[in-house]
Amino acid sequence: MIDIQEIKEALPHRYPMLLVDRVLEVSEDTIVAIKNVTINEPFFNGHFPQYPVMPGVLIMEALAQTAGVLELSKPENKGKLVFYAGMDKVKFKKQVVPGDQLVMTATFVKRRGTIAVVEAKAEVDGKLAASGILTFAIGN
């Protein structure tokens, strides 16, 4: 398990853009993390005041950060940054609302030099909320 302090050591993101609360599992190429979604998230002020829903693009950002924790916690990548380079086959299946816990899984499926491709999914209560293929560049 990786706690919030270690996550902050790996990622450059800070409030309100740090979207990973804890890592539950980590292996060489797969990571499982959580984001506890609360009504106090700043984006709920405008998305939408009467019916708060987590923006899909922020779910994808949370998945990207999850993958970033895995990559940046490797000794050879200490001090580097992960740059989000693209998304493909993104699907949103379930709304994410205050009180939900996003369980995010990212698996690296391809690496070539400084480019990495990840299959990622976010679930709430065991149901798929979002998924997609993410591309990253690792750099200084």
UniProtKB/Swiss-Prot annotation:
One Pfam family per UniProt: FabA
Keyword Cell membrane appears in the UniProt entry: no
Chief localization: cytoplasm
Keywords, sorted A to Z: Cytoplasm, Lipid A biosynthesis, Lipid biosynthesis, Lipid metabolism, Lyase
CDD domains in alphabetical order: FabZ (cd01288)
Catalytic site positions: 47
Gene3D superfamilies listed in its UniProt record: Hotdog Thioesterase
This protein's record includes keyword Hydrolase: no
Any one of the GO BP annotations: lipid A biosynthetic process
SUPFAM superfamilies named among the record's database cross-references: Thioesterase/thiol ester dehydrase-isomerase
InterPro entries assigned to the protein according to its UniProt record, in alphabetical order: FabA_FabZ, FabZ, HotDog_dom_sf
Uppermost EC category: lyase
Enzyme nomenclature, EC number: 4.2.1.59
NCBIfam families xref list: fabZ, PRK00006.1
The family this protein is said to belong to: Belongs to the thioester dehydratase family. FabZ subfamily.
Protein name: 3-hydroxyacyl-[acyl-carrier-protein] dehydratase FabZ
Originating species: Streptococcus pneumoniae (strain CGSP14)
Designated gene of the protein: fabZ
